[in-house]
Amino acid sequence: NNMKSGALNLFLLMFISTLTGCTGSDEDSVEANAYAGEFKILALHGGGGSPEGLMGQPGMQDLMSDLPEFEFFFADAPDHDSMCDQCWYADPPGGKGEPNEDRTWADISIEYLDGIVQEYGPFYGILGYSQGCPMATVYIANSNTSFEKAFLFNGYLPTTHSGLNDTINEVAPLDVDALIFGGENDVFIFGVEELAGV
């Protein structure tokens, strides 16, 4: 497992450094000059998780150690009566078997993330883990915030929320370079192809 984590971190380091122009070349890079802000990553935990839980995962610890030039901001899902505890948005009212067509279902979290970006941004990238992946794609599709990179780990699209999914599909392809990762034994492995489609 440590070998897989190390290989993923090496790949991430190459992905980030290549696309930011940090290739060791003395020549100026268009990509390196395109982003002038600090290298901050907005990280979204999974449903039922927490910022501390995501931050404490061994793979995340390795990633932060391997990328000391990046600052990671771990957002906490808003605490709201309409949502489950530590979730970015609630399950559909009729359960996951009955897709929810409400296009505003994640507005509380979108507004919350807008506030985070305004107070702590700008952010170079957005990272989502599990339910943080669909929230990241919903946020990219429904806000005026732009990111250079998206890192989507073990996630999926909000297909049980057809209204939210429609807001993503209407603006697809999303204008952000993305690294999408899914583990072979992950219950959400189907999400890799879904996410790659937007």
Report residues per predicted region.
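Secretory targeting signatures
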Residues: 1-34
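Serine-hydrolase catalytic machinery in alpha/beta-hydrolase-like enzymes
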Residues: 38-123
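The conserved beta1-alpha1 loop
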Residues: 42-47, 154, 182-183
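Short alpha-helix in the alpha/beta-hydrolase fold that links the catalytic acid
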Residues: 55-60, 164-165, 189-198
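Active-site nucleophile loop of the alpha/beta-hydrolase fold
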Residues: 77-78, 150-159, 185
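Gly/Ala-rich beta-loop-alpha elbow adjacent to hydrolase catalytic centers
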Residues: 124-136
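Acidic catalytic loop of the alpha/beta-hydrolase fold
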Residues: 158-159, 182-190, 195
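Short beta-strand/loop motif that positions the catalytic acidic residue
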Residues: 174, 179-182
